[in-house]
């Protein structure tokens, strides 16, 4: 084995020279230079500074403007809540531990940080699944003129939380475990060891199949069908021009969210899968730290995409920030938006 395993940690560094110490008790500067830990702290600070205001503003603007409280927006707000979980439960902790060079909060703190980070990521993934299914049902109409209403949105929200908890909670109760990863300043699910005492191998397989592969298959199936249907409808002119434009724009926004999610999380998932399937292989702490950087950036891209691609939300946000006046001259009360005939979504 090219790493060092302890009772509740795995350090990707051989202890042949006797320098490895518990990441809960001692600085890990033998893994990387102190300035690299400082860079990690600076990155976490940037994510907090950007992630908290933009996600909080997304929630606040929606509360302030009744016109934004549409069923589809409930799912998008769920993404903002998930991102705030990551900001408060993950980024603030990693910022503090990076400044100290090790995970100062101990195994209990590691469990909490790993739980909130995993919960936030899974809520985001399953929210994208619900959005994909909504787009598929509304645009492709496999169930005739189905209308995505408030009850369906609430059921979708419940699904995201149930599935996220089904992934994040088991390591807290003995099925797998959370351990420090990368530079040992943040925690995640143990991909590094088989750990038969906590049936780690079965959990990792379960997580990759149920909480990563299946959601991606659903998403790609829905959008594959959706792209085909939109092209076919455009060719046959089955819908009005306004409806077609609205459906296309909402669909484009959600697809961009999915692509951004893959950019953020696919490197992390791929590296984690490689580590798990190559037990004991030689890899350094940076090997897992860099993909984690991409994953953590997920907290800021969803609201940015939504604000940039949704004119109605953008106008409402500017009105809120500018004390009731839109500097672009678009009167909130007279803002014209394109609503789809089936889903009542107002995209850009």
From Swiss-Prot:
Its main location: membrane. The modification Phosphoserine is found at residues 334, 338, 343. Phosphorylated on some or all of the serine and threonine residues present in the C-terminal region. Contains one covalently linked retinal chromophore. Upon light absorption, the covalently bound 11-cis-retinal is converted to all-trans-retinal. After hydrolysis of the Schiff base and release of the covalently bound all-trans-retinal, active rhodopsin is regenerated by binding of a fresh molecule of 11-cis-retinal. The modification N6-(retinylidene)lysine is found at residue 296. GO terms for cellular component: cell-cell junction; Golgi apparatus; membrane; photoreceptor disc membrane; photoreceptor inner segment membrane; photoreceptor outer segment; photoreceptor outer segment membrane; plasma membrane. SMART domains: 7TM_GPCR_Srsx. Gene3D superfamilies: Rhodopsin 7-helix transmembrane proteins. This is Rhodopsin. It comes from Sus scrofa (Pig). The gene is RHO.
